Amino acid sequence: MSEILPYGEDKMGRFGADPEGSDLSFSCRLQDTNSFFAGNQAKRPPKLGQIGRAKRVVIEDDRIDDVLKGMGEKPPSGV
């Protein structure tokens, strides 16, 4: 974790060409950056073998056994 000492108004420089113009006053504090960078590390990218693979699909069809048996018995047509 980093620590940054706050700047006072006397250490802040003026911006712009007009030195008598309105003052730009702001403060910048660095907070805990570990939580900022750790957010994406919780989810790891997939391994090379997992890319493009579908999850398991459950087919709920009463006719699936008949269809699969019928495909094996029929010769290919059009040859």
Swiss-Prot record:
Q: Does the keyword Membrane apply?
A: no
Region Inhibitory domain: list its residue ranges: 43-69
| Main location class | nucleus
Query: Which region ranges are annotated with the description Disordered?
Result: 1-21
Taxonomy, superkingdom:
Eukaryota
Q: Where in the cell is it found?
A: Nucleus; Cytoplasm, Cytosol; Synapse
* Biological-process GO terms, alphabetical: regulation of synaptic plasticity
- Presence of the UniProt keyword Flavoprotein in the record: no
Q: Which of UniProt's keywords are assigned here?
A: Cytoplasm, Nucleus, Protein kinase inhibitor, Synapse
Instruction: Give GO terms: molecular function aspect only.
Output: calcium-dependent protein kinase inhibitor activity; protein kinase binding
Tissue specificity field: Expressed in forebrain, hippocampus, midbrain, cerebellum, and testis. Expressed in forebrain, hippocampus, midbrain, and cerebellum (at protein level). In the cortex expressed more in laminae II and III than in laminae IV-VI. Expressed within the pyramidal layer of the hippocampus and granular layer of the dentate gyrus as well as in the olfactory bulb. Diffusely expressed within the caudate-putamen and globus pallidus. Diffusely expressed throughout regions of the midbrain. In cerebellum, expressed within the Purkinje and granular layer. Stronger expressed in the cerebellum.
Biological role stated in the UniProt entry: Potent and specific cellular inhibitor of CaM-kinase II (CAMK2). Traps Ca(2+)/calmodulin on CAMK2.
Q: How does it assemble?
A: Interacts with CAMK2A and CAMK2B in the presence of Ca(2+)/calmodulin or after autophosphorylation.
Would you identify the family this protein belongs to, as annotated? Belongs to the CAMK2N family.
Under what name is this protein listed? Calcium/calmodulin-dependent protein kinase II inhibitor 2
Give the taxonomic lineage as stored in the record: Eukaryota, Metazoa, Chordata, Craniata, Vertebrata
